[in-house]
Swiss-Prot record:
Cofactors (names): Mg(2+)
Family statement drawn from the similarity comment of this UniProt entry: Belongs to the isocitrate lyase/PEP mutase superfamily. Isocitrate lyase family.
Taxonomic lineage from the root: Bacteria, Bacillati, Actinomycetota, Actinomycetes, Mycobacteriales
Coiled coil: none
Primary gene name: aceAa
Protein's UniProt name: Putative isocitrate lyase subunit A
Taxonomic source organism: Mycobacterium tuberculosis (strain ATCC 25618 / H37Rv)
Length: 367
């Protein structure tokens, strides 16, 4: 389903060509391929974004069409494809040779193996927007190369040899991890464009909030409102329509594991939100801020200074008042959950006081 528009007056050949493209795009929207899909934009808006120089993304387009038909066939038969994510192009080729029809390229694989600029770790989507499309490009190139090599070798065979040698399907049936889209609508469109350009036909987009994105096994997931996720999906389909690719979009949710949401603005989310029933109890945020304020003020109350400053103060006061000063180190009370507090990279903070008696040097420790 889509919003249809008609133009009553067309004069110039340029406008006529434009209207023909709009009509063709509307027929494309209304085809059975997109039954049940509601677009929040018009065919005219899509054509306005295409320009006059056609660009054909044949690898992604052909793979998307064939992959979609295969998935619908399996769905009708109540069957599925069991697959996994390869770490290398060689593994992707081996998967195809083993009869695994589809390949899943997860952001977790990109994060886990790292790169020349990124440390390996859990999938927090902290890698650049281009990282997963670049990894996908390597897999697609490997599959296309394997297909060319197979085609050449089979041409050298006799008919009997070809009949005895299995022909593998190296079409890049890939679902790639688009994560949260890496931002707003322009970022989602940019990401989908990159996937299409390297030949990827499928993409999953999840409903976590960028910046707080967590790997599947981690807690603390924060969801965006439903309307924000819909905007992401709509932006992805808009970019695919501009590029004339019937890509496969997987709308993924982390709602099963997440217990936080970014906003309560969308009424569709409100039935699932928790609310306090005792208004005399301070809010969680107020309690948390009070706790932070309590421990933050500790730093000023404890009079933290570096030991050399305390020693200079004690040396100045001693002849002036006729008293000796005692300076001692108290490193442990200043320690946070991540380490001791420091005033610079080479000094440790100290809590100090002066008293009567002889001065003794404190033990210094580098943090």
């Amino acid at each position: 389903m889509a919003i249809a528009e008609t133009d009553t007056e067309v004069h110039t050949p340029f406008e006529q060509d434009f209207e023909k493209d709009v009509a063709a795009t509307q027929r494309y929207f209304d085809s059975s391929r997109f039954a049940g899909i509601i677009r929040l934009y018009t065919a005219r808006q899509v054509v306005e974004q295409r320009g006059t120089i056609p660009v054909d993304h044949i690898v992604a387009r052909e793979a998307a069409g064939a992959f979609y038909e295969r998935l619908r066939e399996l769905f009708a038969a109540r069957k599925s494809i069991t697959t996994f994510g390869p770490y290398s192009p060689g593994q992707a080729v081996s998967m195809k040779r083993m009869g695994i029809e589809a390949i899943y390229l997860g952001g977790w694989a990109t994060s886990a193996k790292g790169s020349s600029t990124e440390d390996p770790g859990p999938d927090l989507a902290s890698y650049p927007l281009s990282q997963v499309p670049d990894d996908a490009a390597v897999l697609v190139r490997a599959l296309l190369t394997a297909d060319r090599n197979q085609h050449y070798l089979r041409l050298q065979m006799s008919e009997r040899q070809r009949a005895a040698t299995p022909a593998y399907d190296f079409r890049p049936f890939i679902i790639a991890d688009a994560g949260t889209g890496h931002g707003g609508d322009p970022h989602v469109r940019n990401l989908i464009r990159r996937f299409v350009e390297v030949g990827v036909p499928g993409y999953h987009i999840e409903d976590q909030r960028p910046g707080t994105k967590k790997c599947g096994h981690q807690g603390g997931k924060v969801l965006v409102p439903s309307d924000e996720q819909i905007k992401r999906l709509n932006a992805a389909r808009f970019q695919l329509d501009i590029m004339r690719v019937p890509g496969i979009i997987v709308a993924r949710t982390d709602a099963e594991a997440a217990n936080l949401i970014d906003s309560r603005a969308d009424e569709r989310d409100q039935p699932f939100l928790l609310g306090a029933t005792k208004l005399d109890v301070p809010s969680y945020k107020s309690c948390f801020l009070a706790m932070v304020r309590r421990f933050t003020n500790w730093a000023s109350r404890s009079s933290m200074v570096i030991f050399s400053m305390r020693l200079a103060t004690a040396s100045t006061r001693r002849p002036a008042v006729g008293l000796s000063a005692k300076a001692f180190s108290a490193w442990s009370p200043t320690r946070s959950t991540r380490g001791g507090r420091t005033a610079s990279s080479r000094s440790t903070a100290f809590s100090t006081r002066s008293s009567r008696g002889s001065w003794r040097p404190g033990r210094t420790t580098r943090a």
